């Protein structure tokens, strides 16, 4: 078997990626989220495939087809809730994965990092379009509000929005094309994830110390296959407990009402994983300015390799940067909370301060902290 694993053209690729891959001996549980994201993608594609067998992408029957899945299809309710909450699990793992990358300086692998940002954008687009499909109140109004933001683009904005809608409002054409894109994008994400892995294996994994680990490598199997498997068991147990006991906790009650273009919900808000970006969007009174801030809130991640001023790669031994990192995490929690609140005092000013702090920490304070820490090391 060993000979076949190393000689067969197909098995050889798997062997180099998951079995004989040399890995640092000291990577912690924070390195489990890559494999967990792969698990999330498999769960979402599998559950989504079964949902697509019973779903109809038509404005008249979309809402009732989801009700039919929950009531009449064998274990349809379970598949539906696994898929809906699977998106939340996906983003939770995604944000922890990105946080790990920032804390330990993994962004210094520029190609891997930039493909990761592309994966984030693709996942966000997929999740947004998936949220529109049940055709509830929040689905319809969420689609209307978010697609309408493109009208802020000078000169071509209005034409672009009507082109995406396939008409003069969010309607049947919009729903049909969103379903088509929502179905194909996860496979594009899977292919992009392969490229992400390809570039990662060119350099090898980073480690908590942020130093080269060539002198101390261990094979991926059995050490990290078992470590990843433990993570999978813990996450699956927690996830299924959540799905079976609190399936609607993260959903919006408005989405249990069919879409009605004549009745606007009092508070239009996206799912929890977009609230931080939504808060940044709303914190700027100008429409175009808000859209630019929204895009930059994610795109700013691409600047991390350029803004790295510290002599050390990881934040493990950099207390000032650590303090700023955890302040940034707290700030993101505040933005998430503000994104779910109505636009009224004191939430407006809190959101604006939190948005300024978000960009200040990333663009100004972290690079300065790196330089200060370099000075301290020389003393």
Curated annotation (Swiss-Prot):
Keywords: Electron transport, Heme, Iron, Membrane, Metal-binding, Mitochondrion, Mitochondrion inner membrane, Respiratory chain, Transmembrane, Transmembrane helix, Transport, Ubiquinone. One of its GO terms (biological process) is mitochondrial electron transport, ubiquinol to cytochrome c. Heme b b562 binds at residues 83, 182. The keyword Membrane applies. Pfam families: Cytochrom_B_C (PF00032), Cytochrome_B (PF00033). Coiled coil: none annotated. GO terms for molecular function: metal ion binding; ubiquinol-cytochrome-c reductase activity. Binds 2 heme b groups non-covalently. GO terms for cellular component: mitochondrial inner membrane; respiratory chain complex III. Heme b b566 binds at residues 97, 196. It is a multi-pass membrane protein. Its main location: mitochondrion. The chain crosses the membrane at residues 33-53, 77-98, 113-133, 178-198, 226-246, 288-308, 320-340, 347-367. A ubiquinone binds at residue 201. Its cofactor is heme b. SUPFAM superfamilies: a domain/subunit of cytochrome bc1 complex (Ubiquinol-cytochrome c reductase), Transmembrane di-heme cytochromes. Belongs to the cytochrome b family. Component of the ubiquinol-cytochrome c reductase complex (complex III or cytochrome b-c1 complex) that is part of the mitochondrial respiratory chain. The b-c1 complex mediates electron transfer from ubiquinol to cytochrome c. Contributes to the generation of a proton gradient across the mitochondrial membrane that is then used for ATP synthesis. Heme 1 (or BL or b562) is low-potential and absorbs at about 562 nm, and heme 2 (or BH or b566) is high-potential and absorbs at about 566 nm. The cytochrome bc1 complex contains 11 subunits: 3 respiratory subunits (MT-CYB, CYC1 and UQCRFS1), 2 core proteins (UQCRC1 and UQCRC2) and 6 low-molecular weight proteins (UQCRH/QCR6, UQCRB/QCR7, UQCRQ/QCR8, UQCR10/QCR9, UQCR11/QCR10 and a cleavage product of UQCRFS1). This cytochrome bc1 complex then forms a dimer. This is Cytochrome b. It comes from Chaetodipus californicus.
């Amino acid at each position: 078997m060993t000979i076949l694993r190393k000689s067969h053209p197909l098995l050889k690729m798997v062997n180099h990626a998951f079995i004989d891959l040399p890995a640092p001996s000291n990577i912690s549980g924070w390195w489990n989220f890559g494999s967990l994201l792969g698990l999330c993608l498999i769960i979402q594609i599998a559950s989504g495939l079964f949902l697509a067998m019973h779903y109809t992408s038509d404005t008249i029957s979309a809402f009732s087809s989801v009700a039919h899945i929950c009531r009449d299809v064998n274990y349809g309710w379970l598949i539906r809730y696994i898929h809906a909450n699977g998106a939340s699990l996906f983003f939770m793992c995604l944000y922890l994965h990105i946080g790990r990358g920032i804390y330990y300086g993994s962004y210094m692998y520029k190609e891997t990092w930039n493909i990761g940002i592309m994966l984030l954008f693709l996942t966000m687009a997929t999740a947004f379009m998936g949220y529109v499909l049940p055709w509830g109140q929040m689905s319809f109004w969420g689609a209307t509000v978010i697609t309408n933001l493109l009208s802020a683009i000078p000169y071509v904005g209005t034409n672009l929005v009507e082109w995406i809608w396939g008409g003069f409002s969010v309607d049947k054409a919009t729903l049909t094309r969103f379903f088509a894109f929502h179905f194909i994008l996860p496979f594009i994400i899977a292919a992009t994830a392969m490229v992400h892995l390809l570039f990662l294996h060119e350099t090898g994994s980073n480690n908590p110390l942020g130093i080269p680990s060539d002198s101390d490598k261990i094979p991926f199997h059995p050490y990290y296959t078992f470590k990843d498997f433990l993570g999978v068991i813990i996450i699956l147990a927690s996830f299924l407990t959540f799905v079976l006991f609190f399936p609607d906790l993260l959903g919006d009650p408005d989405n249990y009402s069919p879409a009605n273009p004549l009745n606007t919900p009092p508070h239009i808000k996206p799912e929890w994983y977009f609230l931080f970006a939504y808060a940044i969007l709303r914190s700027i009174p100008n429409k175009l300015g808000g859209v630019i801030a929204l895009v930059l809130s994610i795109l700013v991640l691409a600047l991390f390799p350029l803004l790295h001023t510290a002599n050390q790669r990881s934040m493990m031994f950099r207390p000032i940067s650590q303090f700023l990192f955890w302040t940034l995490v707290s700030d993101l929690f505040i933005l998430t909370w503000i994104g779910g609140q109505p636009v009224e005092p004191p939430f407006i000013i809190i959101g604006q301060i939190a948005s300024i702090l978000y960009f200040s920490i990333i663009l100004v304070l972290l690079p300065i902290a790196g330089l200060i820490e370099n000075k301290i090391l020389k003393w």
